[in-house]
């Protein structure tokens, strides 16, 4: 029950906090639409630490930043726990992150109480397994403060071929 309340709260917070940005539509690409609130800086640092660990291939450090009940959405699929992610895509994600450089192009986020959201856009370019990669990326991460640390409770990744 508590888990459902936390997830519901996270979704409600994400939608509430993002509503002003979403309401503007694509024509309103203003500086305000890409603002990281000061309250979210430490949560964003956790997101950066997660990606840094993946790039180093340090899967233990990466998973230490995930809540046990993390939800990870990618490519139409979902992994419903840290253990499931560890046993399925973690190794491949680390391998890909090590091989293909990424560039953060835009970030926004807010934190309220024990919950935070970080939305990032970027571009990945390089070669992976002998094939060229050039993709625009979008990522939304929801975090929950546990004591003095942020834990990642939800990740949604998507990408599209760059034009």
Where does each model-flagged region fall?
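A short, structured loop/turn motif at beta-sheet edges
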Residues: 109-116, 130-131, 143-151
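Short beta-strand edge/turn micro-motifs at domain boundaries
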Residues: 24-26, 136-161
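Short, low-complexity N-terminal intrinsically disordered segments enriched in polar/charged residues
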Residues: 2, 22-68, 84, 163
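Bacterial N-terminal signal peptides that target proteins for export
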Residues: 1-10
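Cleavable N-terminal signal peptides
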Residues: 10-11, 21
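Hydrophobic/aromatic beta-strand elements that line small-molecule binding cavities or substrate pockets
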Residues: 85, 103-109, 122-124, 138-144
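A solvent-exposed, acidic/Ser-Thr-rich amphipathic alpha-helical stretch
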Residues: 59-111, 133
């Amino acid at each position: 029950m508590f888990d459902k309340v936390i997830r519901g709260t996270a979704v409600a917070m994400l939608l509430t906090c993002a509503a002003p940005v979403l309401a503007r539509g694509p024509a309103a690409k203003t500086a305000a639409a890409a603002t990281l609130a000061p309250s979210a800086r430490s949560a964003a640092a956790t997101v950066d630490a997660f990606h840094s660990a993946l790039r180093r291939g340090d899967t233990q450090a990466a998973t230490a930043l995930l809540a046990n009940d993390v939800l990870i959405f990618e490519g139409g699929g979902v992994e419903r726990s840290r253990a499931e992610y560890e046993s399925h895509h973690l190794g491949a994600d680390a391998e890909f992150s090590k091989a293909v450089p990424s560039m953060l192009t835009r970030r926004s986020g807010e934190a309220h109480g024990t919950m935070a959201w970080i939305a990032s856009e970027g571009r990945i370019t390089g070669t992976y397994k002998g094939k060229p990669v050039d993709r625009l990326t979008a990522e939304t991460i929801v975090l929950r403060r546990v004591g003095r640390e942020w834990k990642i409770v939800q990740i949604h990744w998507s990408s599209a071929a760059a034009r």
